[in-house]
Regions:
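Short beta-strand/loop motif that positions the catalytic acidic residue
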Residues: 373-375, 380-382, 386
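Alpha/beta-hydrolase active-site loop
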Residues: 257-278, 284
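N-terminal targeting or regulatory segments adjacent to alpha/beta-hydrolase or S9 domains
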Residues: 1-164
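N-terminal cap/lid segment of alpha/beta-hydrolase-fold proteins
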Residues: 144-191
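Acidic catalytic loop of the alpha/beta-hydrolase fold
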Residues: 384-389, 416-417
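Short, surface-exposed "cap/lid" segments of acyl-processing enzymes
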Residues: 177-195, 204-251
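Catalytic histidine-centered segment of alpha/beta-hydrolase-like enzymes
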Residues: 413-427
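Hydrolase active-site cap/lid region
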Residues: 301-361
Length: 438
């Protein structure tokens, strides 16, 4: 039966009733009350819908602000439960920490203490017991280690290249329109090139003609890049490790928020120019996480791209839309809030609400779609267990450009922890790739 039929029949019936029954004061009051209730009900429905839309918009804006807002200090996230420095057992000194996904992960890590001022290096998992993980204690911190709170980190090398690695370095400034960006410069090793087993050969580049420019990820610091410096140093590549806008030790841009690579590539371009001005003829770009997104933007948007010889990406953000949708699901945001937040990034009128200086074109940051624009050889290292930047877009990019992209999965590694999980393999893969392309 058509939707209009019952309504019409009811209307006719109501009219017939009105004609038959007298309408007194009580009936009129009841009718007025019913009309008011109906009016308030309709207004309430509209208000509820408006409130729901406002709530979704608010959630979307809050979500995006958390993504673009730099975080320079992170809270402690693990507890040290016990420390055995005597090493009476076969495993030597050990430390017991609360168990979770990160403390169970294989490899080498650090416990950051006192707000990151001290660090204890830990190694393999010795055993797991009720709610706790016992790991090798490779290097206790100065001042000792005792039960208490700490922060778990994959940035094993804490400090600068000299204090953390024993490599001579210079503190330099990279000139940009925003001001000087601090950077570490590590000269190449002189003489014989040492390469990991399985990567025999030489770069054939004497005199530092090829430099490496290393770019850290979102929320990290230049220390994240130090894991790669010893290998690159042995391969004869001078290393330049710059900060970029909105880092704690770098000038902020006007809004003080990340551009997700859409603006930061200009700072890495300035670092490449610094290298070219100081003796480099070509560069290798190495980027972690958002640093990978930054590197990819430079490789296609900068006039210096023709001086880039090769690219190494570790856990890179290949498609920001995929990463943001994944983050929204992890944070249990309504589907509409996540999608709206992504759409808001590109809207000029949402800049003030989101705290960004310019709209961010997420489509321009999708390298699966833009795969045919790549012109440089890429080594792409990623882990299937990465729960921050999913591996899917990296796999799709590698499948789209097998002529340029060499893809290597690191089972069991978490986000940007490929080196931590298997440093020997990481160095072997990077050395083999660079020796082939330099």
């Amino acid at each position: 039966m058509p939707w209009g039929a019952p309504v019409a029949a009811a209307g006719c019936g109501l009219g017939a009733v009105r004609r038959r029954l007298p309408v007194g004061p009580v009936a009129r009051r009841r009718a007025r009350t019913a009309a008011r209730v109906a009016a308030w009900s309709g207004a309430g429905a509209v208000a509820a819908t408006s409130l729901a839309a406002a709530a979704v918009s608010g959630l979307a804006a809050f979500f995006v602000r958390q993504v673009v807002r730099p975080v320079h200090e992170r809270p402690d996230d693990v507890r040290v439960l016990a420390v055995d420095l005597e090493g009476a057992g076969p495993d030597g000194p050990v430390v017991t920490v609360t168990a979770d996904a990160q403390t169970r992960a294989p490899g080498r890590y650090v416990l950051l203490l006192d707000g990151g001022r001290r660090a204890a290096q830990v190694g393999r998992v010795v055993r797991e017991e009720r709610g706790a993980v016992v790991r090798e204690l490779l290097a206790p911190p100065e001042g000792g280690l005792a039960p208490g709170s700490a922060r778990w980190s994959g940035t094993v090398h804490v400090g600068d290249p000299t204090s953390a690695l024993g490599l001579a370095h210079e503190d330099v400034r990279v000139a940009t329109p925003l001001g000087g960006l601090p950077a570490w410069f590590v000269p190449a090793a002189r003489g014989r090139r040492d390469v990991p087993e399985g990567g025999a050969g030489s770069t054939g580049r004497e005199g530092g003609a090829v430099w490496a420019v290393l770019v850290h990820g979102r929320g990290a610091t230049r220390e994240e890049c130090l894991r790669a410096v010893p290998l690159l140093h042995r391969l004869g590549l001078p290393c330049l490790v710059p900060a970029y806008r909105n880092d704690a030790d770098a000038p902020p841009e006007s809004a003080g928020h990340y551009g997700l690579g859409d603006t930061e590539w200009l700072d890495v371009e300035a670092a490449v120019l610094h290298a070219l001005d100081h003796g480099a003829r070509e560069v290798v770009l190495v980027g972690w996480s958002m640093g990978g997104a930054i590197v990819l933007q430079l490789a296609t948007r900068s006039w210096t791209a023709d001086r880039v010889r090769a690219v190494v990406l570790d856990s890179p953000v290949v498609d920001w839309r995929d990463v943001l949708e994944h983050a929204a699901r992890r944070n249990r945001l309504p589907w509409a809030a996540g999608r709206l937040g992504i759409a808001m990034l590109a809207r000029p009128e949402a800049r003030a609400l989101l705290g960004v200086s310019a709209p961010i074109d997420v489509a321009r940051l999708d390298w699966v779609v833009r795969a045919d624009e790549l012109r440089l050889p890429v080594l792409l290292l990623h882990a299937a267990d990465d729960d921050v930047v999913p591996i899917g877009p990296s796999r799709r990019l590698a499948a789209a450009r097998p002529d340029l992209v060499v893809f290597r999965d690191f089972p069991g590694a978490q986000h940007t922890k490929e080196w931590n999980t298997d440093p020997e393999r990481w160095e072997r893969e990077v050395a083999r790739f660079l020796l082939e392309h330099l």
